Amino acid sequence: MKELVNILDFLPEELGEKIKPMFRVKQIYQWIYQKYANNFSDMSSLPKDLRLELAQNFHFSPVKCVKNEQSKDGSIKYLFELVDGLRIESVLLPMKEEKIDAEGKRISHARYTICVSSQVGCKSGCSFCLTAKGGLKRNLSAGEIVGQILWIKKQNNIPYERRINIVYMGMGEPLDNLKNVSKAVKILAQNEGLAISPRRQTISTSGLAKQIKELGQMNLGVLLAISLHAVNDELRTELMPINKAYNIAAIMDAVREFPIDQRKRVMFEYLLIDGINDKLEHAKELVKLLNGIKAKVNLILFNPHEGGLYKRPSLENAIKFQDLLSNKGVTCTIRESKGLDISAACGQLKERAKEQ
């Protein structure tokens, strides 16, 4: 039996090499990403012989949802099974956004962020992260990354034109899979598709300095987030072994070269761990480290998980840490850990075995 190819792996120009004329490719894109077609036979504006040809050569179901859990805060965690049987997790984070209309009335509407995985597992080995416990199985293809977003939008009846944010902060190190992640960014940005601007896509990294520079040279227009979590190399190496390859100085040099929109900032994720990196002396060092960088710091309180070595700090200590940064002119927020009760928060995702 002929093996079908995942059509979500293709940019329009690549699909155009296989399907003529080009306007048919645009129609296919619209059916998949905007009309949420379930199969090729649904694509009624295409000639019957083309629909048959597509069905004989392609599929667009690279992920299958085998389980989902909803948090009391509205977050939904999805367990997806890939074609080869491996599993990944993704999270939908709904939030309310309030605006003032022309008449001065306060109106609110739903705003969505989707946290996607870029690998099955991860090889970075961060001591505080559950994903790292199982090691790296393989990279996801661009279509498998896109497939997570498409499935979640379809399942939740989110119109294709509704603006959403994408964060590459699920399982895996995105820059360890830069080729496929960058391609996913381009596919998601297509006007005939989901039309998710790169400015609404944030790529997070544990600090692969070489790949940060490569990403910057691509000029994709994406936002960058650095998982920092420590202010000196000794502690960071203890928490994040990747620091042996790319130390803090190398990371900061790469960040300074990274092209960023004038209205945006490089995001620095800082996981506060009780008694480890949450002292005020650490906050003072962080201020020095970020000097001269257009930065925003996201403070995250450690999220407990099975077999975890660390403890969650008190909110009081986190606020003191935040206040010191803010008073020194560093833009800083304490990030709400959504999905904590369903193990969907930062550091809690993993490849769930098939016992479910």
From Swiss-Prot:
Residue positions binding [4Fe-4S] cluster: 122, 126, 129
Catalyzed reaction equations: adenosine(2503) in 23S rRNA + 2 reduced [2Fe-2S]-[ferredoxin] + 2 S-adenosyl-L-methionine = 2-methyladenosine(2503) in 23S rRNA + 5'-deoxyadenosine + L-methionine + 2 oxidized [2Fe-2S]-[ferredoxin] + S-adenosyl-L-homocysteine; adenosine(37) in tRNA + 2 reduced [2Fe-2S]-[ferredoxin] + 2 S-adenosyl-L-methionine = 2-methyladenosine(37) in tRNA + 5'-deoxyadenosine + L-methionine + 2 oxidized [2Fe-2S]-[ferredoxin] + S-adenosyl-L-homocysteine
Disulfide bond residue pairs: 115-346
Residues of the Radical SAM core domain: 108-341
Cofactor note: Binds 1 [4Fe-4S] cluster. The cluster is coordinated with 3 cysteines and an exchangeable S-adenosyl-L-methionine.
SMART domains: Elp3 (SM00729)
Keywords in alphabetical order: 4Fe-4S, Cytoplasm, Disulfide bond, Iron, Iron-sulfur, Metal-binding, Methyltransferase, rRNA processing, S-adenosyl-L-methionine, Transferase, tRNA processing
Requisite cofactors: [4Fe-4S] cluster
Active site residues of this protein: 89 (proton acceptor), 346 (s-methylcysteine intermediate)
An example molecular function term from Gene Ontology annotations: metal ion binding
Residues bound to S-adenosyl-L-methionine: 172-173, 204, 227-229, 303
HAMAP family for this protein: RNA_methyltr_RlmN (MF_01849)
Role noted for this protein: Specifically methylates position 2 of adenine 2503 in 23S rRNA and position 2 of adenine 37 in tRNAs. m2A2503 modification seems to play a crucial role in the proofreading step occurring at the peptidyl transferase center and thus would serve to optimize ribosomal fidelity.
Family: Belongs to the radical SAM superfamily. RlmN family.
Name of this protein: Dual-specificity RNA methyltransferase RlmN
Source organism of this protein record: Campylobacter jejuni (strain RM1221)
The gene coding this protein: rlmN
